[in-house]
């Protein structure tokens, strides 16, 4: 898949079985990602983004793992970044969180709610409402489900029983299974339940921006569908979601807007439903499926 943004011929038929992609739709997927005239949702036209990233790069010594990244996420919007293993997806999230290893160095501009945050510590970013659910979930296995959730509230320095109980009921509303297992040790949960707990713990801090690193990793298809359905429901809360996924089909089903990351460069972008019908994305990431990717 060529990383050249200007490349691309409009599709004359839809390999997924949907309506043919128009010339204008195909062209929009190669527009400058920093261009506000290339919206993912109507909100882009009237509201400033929660997150706006420009010319973002990450180096490990002399190796540039990520270069020239530009993306934006609106309130209540789900933006996905798909791509193969080793493309730099986790590096992107860790760089945005300020969580790179000591050998990593980030450059470029990160604006969160209009504020430059490149110099802020991880703790300061969390306090401002940015939460990352890492690929390995990083739960406390010997602690109960509820104790793990309580730690999420502490991350934002929340005080008072009223705040805590309100946040807890919100999370239990999204994840009824966690409520059933609230006194159970996290280490005894299934893989899907552990992922639910990791997301729930992040939500306990009432984030404005939630970043998810491969939430479908290692999960059965039915559990992936359940997790993605819950992520889709986050739109109702106004939380902005940046979803990193290798499972392109699942990600494009739930997202409003998407980017394709290859060898450290954002090579393609567009509304998720258009990316799902783009021949290059179909051939490389969706296989030869004959039915359109539904939108949750």
Q: What are the functions of these language-model segments?
A:
Residues 185-189:
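Conserved ABC ATPase signature
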Residues 97:
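Helix-to-loop junction immediately C-terminal to a conserved catalytic motif
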């Amino acid at each position: 898949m060529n990383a050249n943004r200007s490349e691309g011929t409009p599709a004359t038929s839809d390999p997924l079985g949907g309506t043919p992609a128009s010339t204008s739709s195909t062209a929009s997927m190669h527009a400058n990602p920093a261009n506000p005239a290339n919206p993912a949702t109507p909100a882009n036209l009237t509201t400033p983004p929660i997150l706006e990233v420009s010319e973002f790069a990450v180096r490990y010594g002399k190796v540039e793992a990520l270069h020239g990244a530009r993306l934006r996420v609106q309130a209540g919007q789900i933006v996905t970044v798909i791509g193969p293993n080793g493309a730099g997806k986790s590096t992107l999230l860790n760089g945005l969180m300020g969580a790179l290893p000591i050998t990593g160095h980030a450059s470029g501009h990160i604006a969160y709610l209009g504020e430059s945050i490149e110099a802020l510590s991880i703790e300061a970013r969390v306090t401002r409402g940015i939460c990352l659910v890492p690929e390995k979930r990083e739960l406390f296995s010997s602690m109960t489900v509820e104790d793990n959730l309580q730690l999420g509230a502490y991350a934002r320095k929340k005080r008072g029983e009223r705040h805590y109980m309100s946040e807890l009921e919100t999370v239990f509303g999204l994840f009824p299974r966690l409520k059933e297992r609230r006194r159970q040790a996290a280490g005894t949960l299934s893989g899907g339940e552990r992922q639910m707990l990791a997301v729930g713990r992040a939500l306990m801090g009432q984030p404005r921006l939630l970043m998810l690193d491969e939430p479908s990793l290692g999960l059965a298809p039915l559990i992936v569908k359940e997790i993605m359905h819950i992520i889709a429901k986050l739109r109702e809360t106004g939380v902005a979601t940046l979803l990193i996924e290798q499972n392109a089909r699942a990600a494009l089903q739930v997202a409003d807007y998407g980017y394709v990351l290859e060898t450290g460069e954002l090579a393609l972008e567009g509304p998720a439903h258009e990316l799902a019908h783009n021949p290059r994305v179909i051939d490389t990431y969706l296989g030869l499926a004959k039915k359109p990717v539904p939108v949750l």
